């Protein structure tokens, strides 16, 4: 999905705020995904799935760190996430349908914590960005 200059501006404006507390926001998004879509827990057999668990927060930070890395390479998301794509496709074999579920919960979390910044333009840009990241992460499945 092609990101416009305006999309990139909005992504770069909000991602540092999210990345500053990646464990909190990433953990919240994961917790919501696990709660709403229990089948996504399959890949985390030893996790404590309670709200604010250290395991969910730590993995949430990894998710947000990866998104921040992708945001630093908006003109080459595929290149910046190639190793992560390989990991999810070949080693972890994550169901590709899980990425849009997590993307949705990231949007919900950002909207909750950043209502002033999450205007329609930022919503559109972040949605396109997360769709692009999801596409890259599932590209090796084909």
Swiss-Prot record:
It comes from the Eukaryota. The keyword Kinase does not apply. One of its GO terms (molecular function) is oxygen binding. O2 binds at residue 59. GO terms for biological process: hydrogen peroxide catabolic process. Keywords: Heme, Iron, Metal-binding, Oxygen transport, Transport. One of its GO terms (cellular component) is hemoglobin complex. The keyword Transmembrane helix does not apply. Residues 2-142 form the Globin domain. Red blood cells. Coiled coil: none annotated. Heme b binds at residue 88. InterPro entries: Globin (IPR000971), Globin-like_sf (IPR009050), Globin/Proto (IPR012292), Hemoglobin_a-typ (IPR002338), Hemoglobin_oxygen_transport (IPR050056). Belongs to the globin family. Involved in oxygen transport from the lung to the various peripheral tissues. Heterotetramer of two alpha chains and two beta chains. This is Hemoglobin subunit alpha-2. It comes from Xenopus borealis. The gene is hba2.
């Amino acid at each position: 999905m092609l990101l416009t200059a305006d999309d990139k501006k909005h992504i770069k404006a909000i991602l540092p705020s999210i990345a500053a507390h990646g464990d909190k926001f990433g953990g919240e998004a994961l917790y919501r995904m696990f709660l709403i879509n229990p089948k996504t827990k399959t890949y985390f057999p030893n996790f404590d799935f309670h709200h604010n668990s250290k395991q969910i927060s730590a993995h949430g930070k990894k998710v947000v760190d990866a998104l921040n890395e992708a945001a630093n390479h908006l003109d080459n998301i595929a290149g910046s996430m190639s190793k992560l794509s390989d990991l999810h496709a070949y080693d972890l074999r994550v169901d590709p349908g899980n990425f849009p579920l997590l993307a949705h919960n990231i949007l919900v979390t950002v909207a909750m914590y950043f209502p002033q910044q999450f205007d329609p333009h930022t919503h559109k840009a972040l949605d396109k960005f997360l769709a692009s990241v999801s596409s890259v992460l599932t590209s090796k499945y084909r």
